[in-house]
From Swiss-Prot:
Belongs to the universal ribosomal protein uL10 family. Part of the ribosomal stalk of the 50S ribosomal subunit. The N-terminus interacts with L11 and the large rRNA to form the base of the stalk. The C-terminus forms an elongated spine to which L12 dimers bind in a sequential fashion forming a multimeric L10(L12)X complex. PANTHER family: 39S RIBOSOMAL PROTEIN L10, MITOCHONDRIAL (PTHR11560). The gene is rplJ. Disulfide bonds: none annotated. Keywords: Ribonucleoprotein, Ribosomal protein, RNA-binding, rRNA-binding. This is Large ribosomal subunit protein uL10.
Length: 176
């Protein structure tokens, strides 16, 4: 059933609003996936906070116009599913990569971060990015390490003194 002009405008506005706020995007070819597999992909996308949409390529090109994902226009050929990450730049890449492991029919065409397009071979780089919580945890451990070493160093001085006094005491007891 063909879409009327108002429906097309609504789709373009919806995808454009998401693209304007997104941190990264993945374009994939879903040709060969069954309806149940697409439903599974959509449910996993909802669980991970990824916006996933199958859009006609001409509408997708209008939707990403004037966003940092306009660079993906060349990849919008054939059956295309768009996946946008809002909070975690690697979420969409992880979702598509993990789903593609089990379903060979899903093929990554391109991905974009910060207005730069990357090829399908670079999905591992984006997928391996830590989540926000993991990055904060790593930062906190890096910041905490010098303080912890300093505290251990400070504790070593009285500990060494106590061990020295105990050694002198043992030496005097054995001499007596």
């Amino acid at each position: 059933m063909p879409l009327n002009l108002e429906d097309k405008r609504a789709i373009v506005a919806s995808v454009n609003a998401v693209a304007a706020e997104a941190l990264s995007a993945v374009v994939a070819d879903y040709r060969g996936l069954t309806v149940s597999q697409m439903t599974e992909l959509r449910s996993k996308a909802r669980e991970t906070g990824v916006y996933l949409k199958v859009v006609r390529n001409t509408l997708a090109k209008f939707a990403v116009k004037d966003t940092e994902f306009e660079c993906l226009n060349d990849a919008l050929v054939g059956p295309t599913v768009l996946a946008f990450s809002k909070d975690d730049p690697g979420a969409a890449a992880r979702l598509i990569k993990d789903f593609a492991k089990d379903h060979d029919a899903l093929e990554v065409k391109a991905l974009a971060v910060g207005g730069v397009t990357y090829g399908a071979q670079d999905i591992d780089v984006l997928a391996k990015l830590p989540t926000r919580d993991e990055a904060i945890s790593q930062l906190m451990s890096v910041m905490q390490a010098p303080v912890a070493k300093f505290v251990r160093t400070l504790n070593e001085v009285p500990g060494k003194f106590v061990r020295t006094v105990a050694a002198v005491k043992d030496q005097k007891q054995s001499a007596a």
